[in-house]
Amino acid sequence: MRKLQALGGAAVLLAALLLGGCSQEATDATPEQAAPAAAAEPTAAPTPTLSVNPLTGLNDGNYANKRPVAVTLRTLYGAQPQWGVAAADVLVEGVTEGGTASLMALYADVDSISRVGPVGPGRDLLLQAALPLNAVPVHIDKNIYAANLLNTLAYQDLDGYHVGKTAFAFDQSRQDAGYREENCWYTTGELIRNGLQSYGASAEGENTPLFRFGTRPEVAPENRNGTNLTVTFSKSDSEQLNYNEGTGLYEKLNADGSPMTDAESGQQVAFTNVFVLYASSGIKDDGYTRQYDMTGGIGIYLNGGAWEQISWTKEDATGPFTLTAADGTPLTVAPGKSFIAIWGGYYGQSLTLTAPDGTAQTLPEKPTLLESGISDEAAAAAEAELSAAQQYVDAQAAVDNATADLAEAESALADAQAALDADSENADLIAARDAAQARIDELNQTIADNQAILSSAPQPEETPAPTEAAEAAPEEAAPAE
């Protein structure tokens, strides 16, 4: 039976909510009569007891009676670079809303966290990777599905929306450098302990191994067929991982191809193991949050520059990932850090993997859609319609802006021409007149080009004004003071 620090909840309700001396007496002997005291033998320092890290399988520390910590990180524009990503034992990523993937960093030892952030809102998809480990979920605010899941299980999280600065801190220098406020909140191991203490909860407790770790055969260079992986979550969000033969690790890159580094340590983010878990996807009842079938599917596993197809199962939200090799035997995972992508394969998502010579690998077919999912054809048609509507809006805005600027440009030309008439041989005035004329020509061309778009594109229907009863999507909250 799986043991959680939190209380269990009803399985049926959970399924619905998912759609802590005595001194010796003196003698009469004189110093001369007293026998010399025996020299005290030095006491050997106790040897630190090492235990296996439940998230990496490495025997490199003391993890007994320590709960892992699962911190949700912000990933939207302006959140990078993030603190603590290279120090994490595991990174889990998957799209929960919109087109940008959500990210969770897992740490086996809370005391190893020097700083992690910017801390983002909790998401139920990510929680399903954390709860089986008896991990402490750490986030700032959370959506309704994450809240329902935690409430059903009576599982205590650490939410900055409630606990505030007891467990979270603000980096003023980061904001002074131009970062938005929500991208400046972070936490540390000490702050996490403080926050848990305020709830009467604890970072001590049982932990569960993430995978079945063990020794794997070394991959010969000629068998390295999976060295460059690109996981596309959307047109605006893709993850690249490239195998480094020197280190034996998969190094994570930013979308622009630059190395992904830790804002705290400056270290390259890299992993021994890379997983892409296929999961059928659809849309939840709010119309925009992603729904995944997390009971199982197929996937790919990368290690040592090679890849293989795997299968995975998961009993429920608190059930661990069970991985099997293609032949049906339990998968042995190499000890080390892991990157886990949960990938729906729906419209706009893709997956490419190449060998060192650039040869593209034939990967398993993408997962099927859930009933609430949108087919590729329907999604493409909707995207085309949206793109056309946006093109019309952009063209109209360009015409309006250019027209507004034209009067000022014509006035500037008149002033430049008047100055030149008074001093016709002045080279600077000639240049100023020519620049003013060029600006007018540019604006007129902009108007003409966008008028052509407006005349050929269908005019989008006007969106009715929202009624008073309409609910707006809640804004993400900053930690409570």
Task: List each model region and its residues.
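Bacterial signal peptide processing site
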Residues: 23-25
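Bacterial N-terminal signal peptides that target proteins for export
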Residues: 1-9
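Sec/Tat-exported extracytoplasmic proteins
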Residues: 95, 129-130, 141, 154, ...
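C-terminal motif of bacterial Sec signal peptides marking the signal peptidase cleavage site
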Residues: 18-21
